[in-house]
Amino acid sequence: MEKVVDLFGVGEANSQKLLEGGKDLSEIQQGLFIGSVAEANNKDFLKSSNITHVLTVAVALAPPYPDDFVYKVIEVVDRSETDLTVYFDECYSFIDQAIQSGGGVLVHCFMGMSRSVTIVVAYLMKKHGMGFSKAMELVRSRRHQAYPNPGFISQLQQFEKSIQGNA
């Protein structure tokens, strides 16, 4: 195997672990999982978890198994000024179609803490008519490391207002 360089700014050893695959999936509801790039790189674990679709919310992470899973990639960075709201509808559709087809969907970013959590919280809010606090509480109860950045939290709070306005 080639030497792993510190591409992700987490040290060579941690970069190696992330690329080899992890097993820290959090099932938020039936068929909907949050994880990190480590889980996205663990083909056998994804298959054993009935994952059929993978939604990547990160830059520079090409789908590792395009012949085995249906992928959607949203290339965004984890910064407060990044506008994730423009992707909420297409992510909602991707997640919902995966679940409706009887499969499972992994939503992941790099660490499974901010971008992926934001997308899943937005999905829950729209799908189940949940408020931001209730959806965030549900996600955190199943994934303790769920901490969207302050900009994403603000976007989710605004999204809640827009959903309530359409009700």
UniProtKB/Swiss-Prot annotation:
EC number: 3.1.3.16, 3.1.3.48
Principal EC category: hydrolase
Tissue: Expressed in flowers, seedlings, roots, leaves, and seeds. Present in stomata and meristematic cells.
Hydrolase in keyword set: yes
Gene Ontology CC: cytoplasm; nucleus; plasma membrane
Keywords, in A-Z order: Cytoplasm, Hydrolase, Hypersensitive response elicitation, Nucleus, Protein phosphatase
Gene Ontology biological process terms in this record: cellular response to oxidative stress; intracellular signal transduction; negative regulation of MAP kinase activity; negative regulation of plant-type hypersensitive response; response to oxidative stress; response to ozone
Knockout consequences: Delayed wilting symptoms in response to Ralstonia solanacearum and, by contrast, acceleration of disease progression during Botrytis cinerea infection, suggesting that this phosphatase plays differential functions in biotrophic versus necrotrophic pathogen-induced responses. Prolonged MPK3 and MPK6 activation during ozone treatment.
Active site: C109
Compartment annotation: Nucleus; Cytoplasm
InterPro entries the UniProt entry points to: Dual-sp_phosphatase_cat-dom, Prot-tyrosine_phosphatase-like, Tyr_Pase_dom, TYR_PHOSPHATASE_DUAL_dom
Catalytic activity, as annotated: O-phospho-L-tyrosyl-[protein] + H2O = L-tyrosyl-[protein] + phosphate; O-phospho-L-seryl-[protein] + H2O = L-seryl-[protein] + phosphate; O-phospho-L-threonyl-[protein] + H2O = L-threonyl-[protein] + phosphate
Positions of the Tyrosine-protein phosphatase domain: 24-165
MF terms (GO), sorted A to Z: MAP kinase phosphatase activity; protein serine/threonine phosphatase activity; protein tyrosine phosphatase activity
Keyword presence, Hydrolase: yes
Main location: nucleus
Induction: Accumulates in response to stress conditions caused by abscisic acid (ABA) or salt treatment.
Any Pfam family: DSPc
Protein function: Has a dual specificity toward Ser/Thr and Tyr-containing proteins. Prevents biotic and abiotic stress responses, including ozone, oxidative stress and pathogen attacks; represses MAPK activities during hypersensitive response to limit the spread of the HR response after infection by necrotrophic pathogen such as Botrytis cinerea. May be also involved in ABA and salt responses. Dephosphorylates MPK3 and MPK6.
The protein's assembly and partners: Associates with MPK3 and MPK6. Interacts with MPK6 is promoted during HR-like responses triggered by fungal elicitors, whereas interaction with MPK3 in repressed.
Family as reported in the entry's similarity comment: Belongs to the protein-tyrosine phosphatase family. Non-receptor class dual specificity subfamily.
Official protein name in the record: Dual specificity protein phosphatase 1B
Gene: DSPTP1B
